[in-house]
């Protein structure tokens, strides 16, 4: 039974309930909060997967945090998912193993889940619940923030217009990322998506300064990394990569490993984004948020939904998964009057390489494009194996062009896309009719296809190409074709750029290409 009674329903009146409840409420209102600050219960009536059902609960609130004390003294925390009469359903973040229905005590805190945030969190490693695991001291909180964040007024959002140079040619030239964008990496098991994300972290920087007065010093850049359900090898890879590059002091890691509780994965990305919002909007830093693996997050969501016996949607995922994913992805961007920004790169592994699976399908709806990691390219030893045809950046048009990158950027990108797509068709046709049946134009497209994958897409994991070097490399490939075949580039552009470096080319580099 409950040892004390809460008083958090100040609008409750005795007229609307039975006299006994009304009397309890009056006692709660007049309770001395110094001696009885919180409500404790020993009324666990059932445990179902990650959920605990409490009975005889008075005035429980939706999303309220509950602290559990197990018989051995272990502390766990949970959140109220549903209240029905005197029963409350609580989702336990650290898992329900060891919870005894007779001896476990539950304490209702009367508050939502808040996380301590501070600029000192940079350089620290936390578990999926936000507790330090690097043997360092607890965080001296500057603020305690709601992990669900604050809604941003759409009118105060700034349209992302500053291109981030990643040093990776297929991204910079054909799928340019703007500061404040949310763009996921669609990958699959066994593909080098972690290496690509680490390379972006190492090499990301602005092409040039924008009109606004902002601080572009390196100290003003921070990375928030959240891992959900990853193995120890992946966590160690990112940690060692940050340490080797000397950027660990600007990185905050949240690690929920594969052997950690599944249910903890639901709050891990929200803790990371709350920290990122504090760094971006209070400390005015430019924050890059990497979330991996969003597929593990969605499966944790499905597990809770199944335990609550909700009506399942496609492939057993809950019908509200779209809304839930949006509450994470929409926390990227820039805000008027604040110097910081949040750029999101979620990583998700497509089950069975299926892009129509609900997780990549819904993610593609919400985010502003995607970077598609291709297994066939990976099998041909191409790194990074980015397939540019299904990849997309919806904010690219506003981040490139004269004054931002170079005036030929958009036209070169369109022409490379067109030639690569035609080259793929020719390659498929060659498999049917043979090379002898191809026209001279078809052979040019086939040559372009091979050189595009070998020289443009392929680069080393520590090779950092500027966007201008990548554009020049694109022109070098387009010179395979005569001018009249470059139909996507205006005449004025071909006159200026087509033969611009022809006399300066080193003959050895042409033969190598």
From Swiss-Prot:
The keyword Glycosyltransferase does not apply. Disruption phenotype: Mice show a higher urinary pH and a more severe metabolic acidosis after oral acid challenge in comparison to wild-type littermates. Mice show diminished innate avoidance behavior (revealed as a decrease in freezing time and an increase in the number of sniffs in the presence of trimethyl-thiazoline) and diminished innate appetitive behavior (a decrease in time spent investigating the urine of the opposite sex). Keywords: ATP-binding, Cell membrane, Hydrogen ion transport, Ion transport, Membrane, Nucleotide-binding, Transport. Gene3D superfamilies: 3.40.50.12240. GO terms for cellular component: apical plasma membrane; basolateral plasma membrane; cytoplasm; cytosol; extrinsic component of synaptic vesicle membrane; lateral plasma membrane; membrane; microvillus. It is found in: Apical cell membrane; Basolateral cell membrane. CDD domains: ATP-synt_V_A-type_beta_C (cd18112), ATP-synt_V_A-type_beta_N (cd18118), V_A-ATPase_B (cd01135). Its main location: membrane. It holds the Pfam family ATP-synt_ab. Disulfide bonds: none annotated. Residues 1-18 have a biased composition (Polar residues). A motif (PDZ-binding) lies at residues 510-513. GO terms for biological process: adult behavior; ATP metabolic process; calcium ion homeostasis; chloride ion homeostasis; olfactory behavior; ossification; pH reduction; potassium ion homeostasis. Residues 1-21 are annotated as: Disordered. ATP binds at residue 394. One of its GO terms (molecular function) is ATP binding. InterPro entries: ATP-synt_VA_C, ATPase_a/bsu_AS, ATPase_F1/V1/A1_a/bsu_N, ATPase_F1/V1/A1_a/bsu_nucl-bd, ATPase_V1-cplx_bsu, P-loop_NTPase, V-ATPase_su_B/beta. The keyword Cell membrane applies. Highly expressed in the kidney; found in early distal nephron, encompassing thick ascending limbs and distal convoluted tubules and in the alpha-intercalated cells of the cortical collecting ducts (at protein level). Expressed in the olfactory epithelium (at protein level). Expressed at lower levels in the testis. The PDZ-binding motif mediates interactions with NHERF1 and SCL4A7. Belongs to the ATPase alpha/beta chains family. V-ATPase is a heteromultimeric enzyme made up of two complexes: the ATP-hydrolytic V1 complex and the proton translocation V0 complex. The V1 complex consists of three catalytic AB heterodimers that form a heterohexamer, three peripheral stalks each consisting of EG heterodimers, one central rotor including subunits D and F, and the regulatory subunits C and H. The proton translocation complex V0 consists of the proton transport subunit a, a ring of proteolipid subunits c9c'', rotary subunit d, subunits e and f, and the accessory subunits ATP6AP1/Ac45 and ATP6AP2/PRR. Non-catalytic subunit of the V1 complex of vacuolar(H+)-ATPase (V-ATPase), a multisubunit enzyme composed of a peripheral complex (V1) that hydrolyzes ATP and a membrane integral complex (V0) that translocates protons. V-ATPase is responsible for acidifying and maintaining the pH of intracellular compartments and in some cell types, is targeted to the plasma membrane, where it is responsible for acidifying the extracellular environment. Essential for the proper assembly and activity of V-ATPase. NCBIfam families: PRK04196.1, V-ATPase_V1_B. This is V-type proton ATPase subunit B, kidney isoform.
